[in-house]
């Protein structure tokens, strides 16, 4: 991969954090009144983590960020910016990023949230890269994805309740040697499809909305799956062609874990072998904006992603928003 931009930027450290509580799909099946086999075969999630009393998205994000900084060998006070992707903040004001800045001790960083739902972390990566390119004095940006969707799920909705889990993932982004790091990032939004996934804490502000469950996430699952099946092949083809590669040249495919069964299907149809696909959704569910960084951190800690490897990231989120990025794992990245 030789066509990366002159000012190359890459991931030099990863971290993640999951809640303590494990929720087996047998428990979910009993809550929904469906067979356990139905969840396993239709969704592919065996268990997920739900935040318990006292656990917050902010706390998960702060621990993931601290781990990423530690692995990168970067002191908190050297961080120039924190970009945090979430669509489930505990409060709209202040943003989660500001709380994380305080928690990790990144006193010199400016911090703010972005919301592109499950696709938000990739938007954060594009934003972070822009910051580093715009000012040579900036050295390090923390990009965090954190969500607690369990708190906006309807336990009676079989379209959403089996899918999601809570968690946070983080990376440290910095300049890396030429020919390494992140290549072109492509992100698209079609607001006409905004009704495909709707919900969230904002509706809690009205008593009637709370009583009627308006804060619960609702999804048109079949429509979302159809969009993924349509757009996924083009995302893959465009990414590899731009760098003069083929699917076989991609060492690792890290996808948003919307539905593990769907991830396996579209990856196989695009020509990927099972060994190329990083799968986490089967054991932690769909962790929304945390999905991609958790996938990266998992593969790094497992020793799968190594310096020089080619990694393709693909994401989808409400909006609808979808995107991709191809990168060569930097030599400066630490396991």
Map each language-model feature to its residues.
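Claisen-condensing/thiolase-fold acyl-transfer catalytic domains that form or cleave C-C bonds
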Residues: 58, 62-65, 69, 88-89, ...
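Phosphate/pyrophosphate-binding loops at sites that engage ATP/ADP/AMP, CoA/4′-phosphopantetheine
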Residues: 64-80, 234-251, 299-304
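Flexible, glycine-rich active-site loops centered on histidine and acidic residues
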Residues: 133-168
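Acidic-glycine-rich active-site phosphate/pyrophosphate-binding loop
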Residues: 32-41, 91-105, 143-149, 204-209, ...
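Glycine/charged-rich beta-loop-alpha catalytic/anionic-binding loops adjacent to active sites
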Residues: 45-47, 78-83, 102-115, 150-156, ...
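Buried hydrophobic positions in well-ordered alpha/beta secondary-structure cores of metabolic enzymes
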Residues: 11-13, 39, 68, 79-82, ...
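Condensing-enzyme catalytic core mediating Claisen C-C bond formation in acyl metabolism
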Residues: 1-53, 155-226, 230, 234, ...
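Short beta-strand segments
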Residues: 12-15, 85, 115, 141-147, ...
């Amino acid at each position: 991969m030789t066509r990366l931009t002159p000012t190359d930027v890459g991931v030099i450290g990863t971290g993640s954090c999951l809640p303590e509580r494990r929720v087996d799909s047998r428990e979910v099946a009993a809550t929904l009144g469906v067979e356990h086999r139905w969840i396993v075969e239709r969704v592919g999630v065996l268990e997920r983590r739900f935040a318990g009393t006292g656990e917050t998205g902010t706390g998960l994000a702060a621990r993931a960020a601290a781990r990423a900084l530690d692995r990168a060998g970067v002191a908190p006070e050297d961080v120039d910016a924190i970009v945090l992707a979430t669509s489930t903040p505990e409060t709209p004001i202040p943003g989660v990023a500001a709380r994380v800045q305080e928690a990790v001790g990144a006193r010199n960083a400016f911090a703010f949230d972005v919301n592109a739902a499950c696709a938000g972390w990739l938007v954060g990566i594009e934003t972070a890269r822009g910051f580093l390119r715009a000012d040579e004095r900036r050295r390090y940006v923390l990009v965090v994805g954190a969500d607690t969707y369990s708190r906006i799920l309807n336990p009676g909705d079989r379209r959403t309740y089996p899918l999601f889990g809570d968690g946070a993932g983080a990376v440290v982004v910095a300049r890396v040697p030429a020919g390494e790091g992140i290549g072109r990032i492509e992100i698209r939004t079609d607001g006409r499809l905004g009704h495909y996934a709707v919900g969230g804490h904002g509706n809690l502000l009205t008593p009637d909305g709370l009583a009627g469950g308006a804060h619960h996430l609702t999804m048109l699952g079949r429509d979302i799956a159809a969009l993924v099946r349509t757009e996924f092949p083009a995302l893959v083809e465009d990414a590899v062609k731009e760098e003069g590669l083929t699917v076989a040249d991609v060492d690792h495919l890290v996808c948003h874990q919307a539905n593990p069964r769907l991830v396996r299907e579209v990856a196989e149809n695009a020509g990927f072998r099972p060994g190329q696909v990083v799968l986490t959704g089967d054991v932690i569910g769909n962790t929304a904006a945390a999905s991609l960084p958790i996938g990266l951190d998992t593969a790094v800690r497992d020793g799968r992603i190594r310096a020089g490897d080619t990694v393709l990231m693909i994401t989808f989120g409400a909006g609808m928003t979808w995107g991709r990025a191809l990168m060569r794992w930097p030599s400066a990245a630490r396991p």
